[in-house]
């Protein structure tokens, strides 16, 4: 989205198409392609311009981001909380880190529903390559330290999120958070993900 005029055209088109919900990711470009430096700028412009959207989602990174400090990420979430309706997290492999992050945002008054991003059924090699590319670093470091979990992940050529889901539901504090459900990253493996579901 290059500027407010472009955003106005997009809002108009969304309205014409009857689209009522959007997701605003942060983006990973080193330099902005237009007037908006980040998702917060875009969300502010959406509010200023007005729209007919019922739901606006924003991204979050429970395990951090390779180019942004955790402090800056948390500040951005706090600033965006009144401009969005739900959160979708980046893909995560560590139930404890996820639980602690969910508790932390709840304590900070960020009470939006959170859809936790999990990898779906996918070839292990493709999952690891994608994880490295998108910066799921803490999870990968976690896997290196926890040989049993890493062994479980590596024991077949296909990754399945069942054990991770079980670990998340067994976290002591998870029921005191705003966990709304799970967003499954299927990596275009729709058929295998649907069979798993």
Describe the residue ranges of each PLM region:
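Catalytic beta/alpha-barrel core
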Residues: 20-26, 85-95, 183-185
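Short, well-ordered coil/turn segments that N-cap beta-strands
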Residues: 18-20, 51-56, 84-85, 110-114, ...
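Active-site-adjacent beta->alpha loops and helix N-cap segments on the catalytic face
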Residues: 2-10, 28-49, 67-71, 91-109, ...
């Amino acid at each position: 989205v290059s500027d407010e005029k472009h955003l106005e055209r997009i809002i108009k088109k969304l309205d014409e198409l009857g689209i009522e919900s959007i997701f605003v990711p942060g983006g990973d470009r080193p330099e902005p392609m237009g007037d908006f430096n980040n998702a917060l700028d875009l969300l502010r412009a959406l509010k200023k311009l007005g729209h007919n959207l019922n739901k606006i989602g924003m991204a979050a990174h429970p395990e951090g981001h390779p180019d942004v400090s955790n402090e800056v990420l948390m500040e951005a979430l706090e600033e965006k909380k009144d401009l969005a309706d739900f959160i979708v997290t980046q893909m995560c492999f560590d139930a404890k880190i996820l639980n602690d992050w969910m508790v932390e945002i709840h304590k900070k008054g960020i009470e939006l529903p959170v859809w936790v991003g999990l990898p779906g059924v996918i070839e292990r090699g493709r999952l690891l390559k994608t994880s490295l590319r998108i910066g799921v670093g803490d999870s990968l470091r976690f896997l290196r330290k926890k040989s049993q979990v890493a062994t479980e992940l590596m024991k077949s050529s296909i990754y399945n999120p069942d054990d991770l889901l079980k670990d998340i539901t067994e976290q002591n504090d998870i029921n005191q958070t705003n966990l709304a459900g799970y967003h499954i990253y299927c990596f275009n493996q729709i058929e295998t993900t649907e069979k798993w579901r």
